[in-house]
Structure formats: C-alpha cells, structure tokens
From Swiss-Prot:
Gene name of the record: rplU
SUBUNIT field: Part of the 50S ribosomal subunit. Contacts protein L20.
Species: Trichodesmium erythraeum (strain IMS101)
Designated name of the protein: Large ribosomal subunit protein bL21
UniProt cross-references to InterPro entries, sorted A to Z: bL21-like, bL21-like_sf, Ribosomal_bL21, Ribosomal_bL21_CS
PROSITE patterns documented for this protein: RIBOSOMAL_L21
Role summary: This protein binds to 23S rRNA in the presence of protein L20.
C-alpha cells in the first residue's frame, strides 16, 4: 500500500491515491488539477522515504472535486453575573480534493487507475429459494 504525508493549510494529512479528502480552501475551480510539493513522507510497499523536512522529487497530483463548507461551530462567550453574552457561528470553507497520483523522482508509485484495478470486487452472496426455510 502506497501513501504519503503532505502538508497543506498548516496541517499534515496522510493521503492515498484514489481517495478524496476535505482540506482548507484552495484557489482554483472545480475540475482543476493541483500539484502538491510539500511532501513530508512517502511509503511504498515497505520502502519509506522521510524528508528533512521535505522529500526531494516527491509530487502529489490531485483534482478539485468541489468547494464546500464544513459543519457549523458555535462560539459562545459569557461573563457571569454581568448579563453579557455573545453567540457566534463559524463554518470553515473547504475543498474536496481527489488524489490522482503519488510520484517520486518522476516515477509514479500509485495512481487513481492503479488503485481502481487493485481493489478486489466485493463478493455478493446469492440467495436462492432452496436455501430459505419457512417457519409455520
């Protein structure tokens, strides 16, 4: 399994190809491709590359799926015995980013197409009339 740890919006995030993540707002519109160079760690089948502070030659490519707003956070301030109360709400602007590929030194380690091929199909159990029993 290949994954990387990136830094975006002042936060560190573990990402894998073929998954989407909600991160702080990025400039760009829906469908734009984004390249992230702030890669702190890359792991590929037991081979770990740790940056000091960044991994040289590592690149994460993704596509902006949509812009959205996070859950509302209520900020409530109160001074006891003074009848002073303030209630404010805040919703963080977010970007949903689909990770397309993880590459190191020009070699693609994981991509969206590879992750779709590698996932096994879910087994569906078939129910036939012979296996059902009626209770009287």
């Amino acid at each position: 399994m290949t994954y990387a740890i990136i830094e975006t919006g002042g936060k560190q995030l573990r990402v894998e190809a073929g998954r989407f993540y909600d991160i702080d707002l990025l400039s760009g519109s829906e469908g734009d491709r984004i390249s992230i160079n702030n890669v702190l760690l890359v792991q590929n089948d037991g081979d770990v590359h740790i940056g000091q502070p960044l991994v040289e030659g590592a690149l994460i490519e993704g596509t902006i799926m949509k812009h959205l707003r996070g859950k509302k956070i209520i900020v409530y301030k109160m001074r006891p015995k003074k009848k002073t109360r303030k209630k404010r709400g805040h919703r963080q602007e977010l970007t949903r980013l689909m990770i397309d590929s993880i590459s190191l030194n020009g070699k693609v380690l994981a991509s969206l197409e590879k992750s779709l091929v590698e996932k096994p199909e879910s087994s569906v159990m078939e129910v036939t009339s012979e296996t059902t029993e009626t209770v009287t």
